[in-house]
From Swiss-Prot:
Recorded name of the encoding gene: thiC
Entry binding sites for Zn(2+): H396, H460
Binding site for [4Fe-4S] cluster: C540, C543, C548
Designated name of the protein: Phosphomethylpyrimidine synthase
UniProt record similarity statement: Belongs to the ThiC family.
Cofactor note: Binds 1 [4Fe-4S] cluster per subunit. The cluster is coordinated with 3 cysteines and an exchangeable S-adenosyl-L-methionine.
Molecular function GO labels: 4 iron, 4 sulfur cluster binding; carbon-carbon lyase activity; zinc ion binding
Catalytic activity: 5-amino-1-(5-phospho-beta-D-ribosyl)imidazole + S-adenosyl-L-methionine = 4-amino-2-methyl-5-(phosphooxymethyl)pyrimidine + CO + 5'-deoxyadenosine + formate + L-methionine + 3 H(+)
Lineage: Bacteria, Bacillati, Bacillota, Bacilli, Bacillales
One term under GO cellular component: cytosol
HAMAP family for the chain: ThiC
EC code(s) of this entry: 4.1.99.17
Enzyme category, top tier: lyase
């Protein structure tokens, strides 16, 4: 891969949406600039009266890639937005960091990764001795950080509300001090429901440039966080390219890379190898780690009678290690030491559900809930260290069993944020699992899940490409927004109301621009009504001009206005006039 190809690949998507522009809302200090996408609307005219429609501002995750005025260079990485805030606190220090070794990228001996990241090189940061640099620690001390104020503006709440939710453990701010490029965001049930998009190469397919492109593509469509699940060669370098160019938090499953370092043999894993991998990724800037510390030796037999056994890759790795050594998981026995690493860099736990159900037949079984009890125990240990925690959840769960998952998680894990994969509500739709899971995602988001991990049409079938990523993100944005509406999140309905008004007034361009996928909406409209005149027509292709329900409604309103009647009387008077016309014409149905 040539460096130029990475830059060229990403330039192709560095554009704003039609009818939109990037705006920034300033906070209490000049360097708090909160990005939003402002959608311009055309005025209401004609029979609807003359009225200016105010632009609509929406939450934006796309970073500088959709800012026409931003100077983005993939080779250098994004600007370190939070660097000043981190430095001002005075509790961090630079140090040399660990040396990058060939095995970090899956190579042996002197063989090196084929594509090093040649951009901006910084020494990593860590907490000074005796210091804790987590947002949870600051929140519990009563400190409102610039990150919290930034989030408050994004979420339309007060900074104190953000601080209190973080201090209570009900919300987390994933924000590794070595990822200053990230724009602060929050994951918690009292905020917008967030979505995560998974990317990553494998030994079978994909390259560094494809993964960087998928990242910029996913955040364009609304991904709030990214997980790099790479398992092939160049793991370290792929992650470096992604993090240096990513404006949203990045998560990983460190056991994947640790396994690569022992040639894929689970029983050869050791605590020392895993610990070294945690520090390697911490220095790069990973914001949250999925750690399957709840998979205990005694729980493994509980999966024996399942239809689909253990389907979590991380869960299966640790189960295999436990059985091979007949010992308790080193993730569990060394959990306090892991907490020390996490608070040194402000990395959040995403406590993995290694025993999640992989089929609806296995949903809500003994193995799943036994692990959840252990995750509750680990949550309290992490909180003792002021380390941020969210809990991962299923999986495959039929609709009538979804609420029990949320209720149990809230109780056992003391309201720590819940982060679920779907869940998929049926197992019979390979190729359409973005839909089967979005049904469950909307429901579980409504019940209180804070973040939804997207599912693409390729789930269970193959690695997603760029188009699959878009499909998955949009599908999950729909689910998350539906949950926000159901929960009554402040301002959630503004965009819906604006689009409904535009639809009723046949402002087609505004309808396209207000939608989650403006390009798809325009494309579908053009398939049947491609002419430019159709963009101002007072009907659509569904019913045509004579039978358009909204046009008929407007005609009734116009008739009422002309005859000084309310709408109900206008309908009755109109019917009477039509009856007279019918009788005058001879009263025959067929003439």
């Amino acid at each position: 891969m040539k460096q130029e190809s990475v830059q060229q690949k990403n330039i192709s998507i560095m554009s704003s949406f039609s009818g939109s522009r990037k705006v920034y809302v300033e906070g209490s200090r000049p360097d708090i600039q909160v990005p939003m996408r402002e959608i311009s609307l055309s005025p209401t005219t004609g029979s609807f009266g003359d009225e200016e429609n105010q632009p609509v501002r929406v939450y934006d995750t796309s970073g500088p890639y959709t800012d026409a005025n931003a100077d983005v260079d993939i080779l250098k990485g994004l600007k370190p937005l939070r660097a000043t805030w981190i430095r001002e606190r005075g509790d961090t220090e630079e140090y040399e960091g660990r040396e990058i070794r060939p095995e970090d990228n899956g190579y042996k001996g002197k063989e090196k990764a084929s594509h090093s990241y040649t951009g901006l090189k910084r020494k990593p940061l860590r907490a000074k001795k005796g210091q804790n640099v987590t947002q949870l620690h600051y929140a519990r001390k009563g400190i409102i950080t610039p990150e919290m104020e930034f989030i408050a503006i994004r979420e339309h709440v007060s900074p104190e509300f953000v601080r209190d939710e973080v201090a209570s453990g009900r919300a987390i701010i994933p924000s590794n001090i070595n990822h200053p490029e990230s724009e602060p965001m929050i994951i918690g049930r009292n905020f917008h429901v967030k979505i995560n998009a998974n990317i990553g190469n494998s030994a079978v397919t994909s390259s560094i440039e494809e993964e960087v492109e998928k990242m910029t593509w996913a955040i364009r469509w609304g991904a709030d966080t990214m997980m790099d699940l790479s398992t092939g060669k160049d793991i370290h370098t792929t992650r470096e390219w992604i993090i240096r160019n990513c404006p949203v938090p990045v998560g990983t499953v460190p056991i994947y890379q640790a396994l690569e370092k022992v040639n894929g043999v689970a029983e050869d894993l050791t605590w020392d190898i895993y610990r070294d991998t945690l520090i390697e990724q911490a220095e790069q800037g990973v914001d949250y780690f999925t750690i399957h510390a709840g998979v205990l030796l005694r729980y493994v037999p509980l999966t024996a009678k399942r239809v689909t056994g253990i389907v979590s890759r991380g869960g299966a790795i640790m189960a295999q290690w436990c059985l091979a050594h007949h010992e308790e998981s080193f993730l569990y026995t060394h959990f306090e030491e892991i907490c020390e690493i996490m608070k040194t860099y402000d990395i959040a736990f995403s406590l993995g559900d290694g025993l999640r159900p992989g089929s609806i037949a296995d949903a809500n079984d003994e193995a799943q809930f036994a692990e959840l009890e252990t995750l509750g125990e680990l949550t309290e240990i992490a909180w003792k260290h002021d380390v941020q925690v969210m809990i991962e959840g299923p999986g495959h769960v039929p609709m009538h069993k979804i609420k029990e998952n949320v209720d149990k998680q809230m109780e056992i894990c003391k309201e720590a944020p819940f982060y679920t994969l779907g869940p998929l509500t049926t197992d019979i739709a390979p190729g359409y699992d973005h839909i089967t899971s979005a049904i469950g995602a909307a429901m579980i988001g409504w019940y209180g899940t804070a973040m939804l991990c997207y599912v693409t049409p390729k789930e269970h079938l193959g690695l997603p490409n760029k188009d699959d990523v878009r499909e998955g993100v949009i599908t999950y944005k729909i689910a998350a927004h539906a949950a926000d509406l159901a929960k009554g999140h402040p301002g959630a309905q503004i965009r819906d109301d604006a689009l409904s008004k535009a639809r009723f007034e046949f402002r087609w361009r505004d309808q396209f621009n207000l939608s989650l996928d403006p390009e798809r909406a325009l494309e579908y409209h053009d398939e049947t009504l491609p002419a430019e005149g159709a963009k101002t027509a007072h009907f659509c292709s569904m019913c045509g001009p004579k039978f358009c329900s909204m046009r008929i409604s407007q005609d009734i309103r116009d008739y009422a206005k002309e005859n000084n009647l309310d709408e109900e009387k206008a309908i009755q008077k109109g019917l009477e006039e039509k009856a007279k016309e019918f009788k005058k014409a001879g009263g025959s149905i067929y003439s």
